[in-house]
Amino acid sequence: MAAPQDVHVRICNQEIVKFDLEVKALIQDIRDCSGPLSELTELNTKVKEKFQQLKHRIQELEQSAKEQDKESEKQLLLQEVENHKKQMLSNQTSWRKANLTCKLAIDNLEKAELLQGGDSLRQRKTTKESLAQTSSTITESLMGISRMMSQQVQQSEEAMQTLVSSSRTLLDANEEFKSMSGTIQLGRKLITKYNRRELTDKLLIFLALALFLATVLYIVKKRLFPFL
């Protein structure tokens, strides 16, 4: 059965290897990082945490080495501790180089964006001028349409007034026509009545004349032919 001290040494070595691999992976992420700075800052924070954990485990391993009873095992563990420290220093050097590479890439990217920003600024200025000109043209067109609609409205009002006047004239003419129709109808009635009266007068005259002639004939008859 393994001694507790040997188990602790084994765990320390496993943790040291794990943290070393995690640090290397984060350093590679920093090399590949192209920004922004906030992402680089976040990666560096993670690297610092891993270095702290790695350093703590190396110190634990070193303490365990010093507590070994056998000198040979002690020297072997101290050699492992020294190798881990060298590897940690190498990782720190790689970390600094990766930061320099990343910051240089971010600076170059920012310069390129500034240059593109100048072109973009000129393009936006040109676009604004074009939009302003287009807006002015549209405004003039809308004003022209507004004037045209105003003229059409005025013409419509004049046409409406003319229509109202014509309607009033037609109504007046209709009233006059109704009045004339009444007058004509009254005249027709009077003429009909007059014609009837004239016929009656003629008939009376004819009857009076016939009566007169009959009377004359009767008198002549009595004078000339008394025996009849």
Swiss-Prot record:
An individual GO BP term: retrograde vesicle-mediated transport, Golgi to endoplasmic reticulum
UniProt membrane topology term: Single-pass type IV membrane protein
Transmembrane regions listed in the UniProt entry: 200-220
Positions in the Lumenal compartment: 221-228
Subcellular location: Endoplasmic reticulum membrane; Mitochondrion membrane
Reported modifications of this chain: Polyubiquitinated. 'Lys-63'-linked polyubiquitination by RNF185 increases the interaction with the autophagy receptor SQSTM1. Undergoes 'Lys-29'- and 'Lys-63'-linked polyubiquitination by RNF186 that may regulate BNIP1 localization to the mitochondrion.
Topological domains annotated Cytoplasmic: 1-199
Keywords annotated in UniProt: Apoptosis, Coiled coil, Endoplasmic reticulum, ER-Golgi transport, Membrane, Mitochondrion, Protein transport, Transmembrane, Transmembrane helix, Transport, Ubl conjugation
Complex formation: Component of a SNARE complex consisting of STX18, USE1L, BNIP1/SEC20L and SEC22B. Interacts directly with STX18, RINT1/TIP20L and NAPA. Interacts with ZW10 through RINT1. Interacts with BCL2. Interacts with RNF186. Interacts with RNF185. Interacts with SQSTM1; increased by 'Lys-63'-linked polyubiquitination of BNIP1.
Role noted for this protein: As part of a SNARE complex may be involved in endoplasmic reticulum membranes fusion and be required for the maintenance of endoplasmic reticulum organization. Also plays a role in apoptosis. It is for instance required for endoplasmic reticulum stress-induced apoptosis. As a substrate of RNF185 interacting with SQSTM1, might also be involved in mitochondrial autophagy.
Family from the record: Belongs to the SEC20 family.
Name of protein: Vesicle transport protein SEC20
Phylogenetic placement of the source organism: Eukaryota, Metazoa, Chordata, Craniata, Vertebrata
